[in-house]
Amino acid sequence: MLYAGIGSRQTPQNVMKAMTDIAQQLGAQEWTLRSGHAGGADMAFELGALKTCSPMEIFLPWARFNGAPRTTEYKVPD
């Protein structure tokens, strides 16, 4: 199963904590996160997915966007 973990770069801290918790719960059930590695909400979802080592597909506008690592989870357009 897939879910999109996206939102505002200006998401309040308490909401980002909830997003991280949700991503952890979904990750524990093997859901795959799709997101964009932007600050704020995207990063909160990504943190939750990373905590459970769950699958991710992170779509970047360019290589190393926001310091993204060069791993197969991080996708850059050709």
Regions found by a protein language model. Give the residues of each.
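Acidic/glycine-enriched connector segments
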Residues: 1-4, 9-78
